Amino acid sequence: MNGTEGPNFYVPFSNATGVVRSPFEYPQYYLAEPWQFSMLAAYMFLLIVLGFPINFLTLYVTVQHKKLRTPLNYILLNLAVADLFMVFGGFTTTLYTSLHGYFVFGPTGCNLEGFFATLGGEIALWSLVVLAIERYVVICKPMSNFRFGENHAIMGVVFTWIMALACAAPPLVGWSRYIPEGMQCSCGVDYYTLKPEVNNESFVIYMFVVHFTIPLIVIFFCYGQLVFTVKEAAAQQQESATTQKAEKEVTRMVILMVVFFLICWFPYAGVAFYIFTHQGSNFGPIFMTLPAFFAKSSSIYNPVIYIMMNKQFRNCMLTTLCCGKNILGDDEASATASKTETSQVAPA
């Protein structure tokens, strides 16, 4: 084995020389240089500085403007809540522990940090699935005369929390476990060991299939059908500039959604899957730490892609920030055209 396993940790460093120490008790500067831990802390600080204001502003602006409280925006707000979970439950902890060079909060703190970070990430992921299904049902119309209403939105939000808890809670009750990962300053699901005492192998397989592969398939299917439907509508109404514009906007949104989803989550999932399927292989702490950067950065991409590109929300945000004045001067008509509750071929 090229790593060192303890009762509640796995350090990706051989203890042949006797230098490995518990990541809950001692600085891990034998894994990486102190300046690298400082860089990790600086990155976490950047995510907090950017992630908290934009997600908090999303919630605040929606509360201030009644016209934003549409059914679909419930899901978008759920994304903001999920991102705030990641900011407060994960980023702040990692910032503090990185400054000390090890996970100073002990196994209990590791469980809490791992739970909240996983919960926030999974709420965001399943919110994207609900958004994809909503766009598919509204635009592609597999069910005629369907209108996405408040009850559907509430059910969608509840569904995201149920699925997120189904992923984040089991390690707290004996199915798998949370341990420090990468540079040992943040915690996540144990991909490093089989750990039969907690049936770790079955949980990791369950997590990859149910909480990554299936959501990815659903998202690709829904947006693939959406693009096809928009192209077909444009082909039948080639003289319609509005339809052609809608096609371009929806296509751009779809490309951004898929690309940033993959950027945020695929590297982390791919590395975790490699580590799990190559037990005992030689890899360094940076190997797992770098992909996690992309996953954590989703707290910034989500509000930018799913909310900031909406004209109505952007106008309301500017009005709130500028004390009732819209400095861009966009009129209400243009804002209304981009309402997320629309049932015609238009981007969310």
UniProtKB/Swiss-Prot annotation:
Domain of life: Eukaryota
Modified how: Phosphorylated on some or all of the serine and threonine residues present in the C-terminal region. Contains one covalently linked retinal chromophore. Upon light absorption, the covalently bound 11-cis-retinal is converted to all-trans-retinal. After hydrolysis of the Schiff base and release of the covalently bound all-trans-retinal, active rhodopsin is regenerated by binding of a fresh molecule of 11-cis-retinal.
Taxonomic classification: Eukaryota, Metazoa, Chordata, Craniata, Vertebrata
Site (Plays an important role in the conformation switch to the active conformation): 113
Function: Photoreceptor required for image-forming vision at low light intensity. Required for photoreceptor cell viability after birth. Light-induced isomerization of 11-cis to all-trans retinal triggers a conformational change that activates signaling via G-proteins. Subsequent receptor phosphorylation mediates displacement of the bound G-protein alpha subunit by the arrestin SAG and terminates signaling.
Family: Belongs to the G-protein coupled receptor 1 family. Opsin subfamily.
Residue numbers covered by motif 'Ionic lock' involved in activated form stabilization: 134-136
Species this chain originates from: Cricetulus griseus
Protein encoded by which gene: RHO
TM segment ranges: 37-61, 74-96, 111-133, 153-173, 203-224, 253-274, 287-308
Protein name listed in UniProt: Rhodopsin
Binding site for Zn(2+): 201, 279
Extracellular side: 1-36, 97-110, 174-202, 275-286
Main location: membrane
Residue numbers of Phosphothreonine PTMs: 336, 340, 342
A GO term, aspect molecular function: metal ion binding
Membrane topology: Multi-pass membrane protein
Entry-annotated residues carrying N6-(retinylidene)lysine: 296
